Amino acid sequence: MSESGKTVTRVDLCEAVYQKVGLSRTESAAFVELVLKEITDCLEKGETVKLSSFGSFMVRKKGERIGRNPKTGTEVPISPRRVMVFKPSAILKQRINNGAAAKTNGDVAKVAAG
């Protein structure tokens, strides 16, 4: 969850495309769905999706391993599986950290002024 407590949904993304691009609401929703479907299809095939200045979505294979049942302590085999990971770009990391620093500095300035 974000610091503001807001979670951005598909509907929010569609509305942003509608407001900023000028497509109709129907076209905006179709556009967002198409982009998400394309990303999903690529990941299903095991392809990496790299979005410049944003980050990369990748599928990694996890091998079989032994886990433990936390209640009983007995060992349980965990089947091999594929997991999706997201690696943010350096630009995105910097923007997130600078944004957090700016908010923190703004709060400090408000407290000092108050």
Curated annotation (Swiss-Prot):
Family to which the UniProt record says this protein belongs: Belongs to the bacterial histone-like protein family.
Described function: This protein is one of the two subunits of integration host factor, a specific DNA-binding protein that functions in genetic recombination as well as in transcriptional and translational control.
Top-level taxonomic group: Bacteria
Subunit architecture: Heterodimer of an alpha and a beta chain.
GO biological process, one term: regulation of DNA-templated transcription
Signal peptide location: none
InterPro entries recorded: Hist_DNA-bd, Histone-like_DNA-bd_CS, IHF-like_DNA-bd_dom_sf, IHF_alpha
Pfam families in UniProt: Bac_DNA_binding
Keywords, sorted A to Z: DNA recombination, DNA-binding, Transcription, Transcription regulation, Translation regulation
Name of the molecule in the record: Integration host factor subunit alpha
Alphabetical list of PANTHER family matching this protein: DNA-BINDING PROTEIN HU, INTEGRATION HOST FACTOR SUBUNIT ALPHA
Matching Gene3D superfamilies: IHF-like DNA-binding proteins
GO cellular component: cytosol
Molecular function GO terms recorded: DNA binding; structural constituent of chromatin
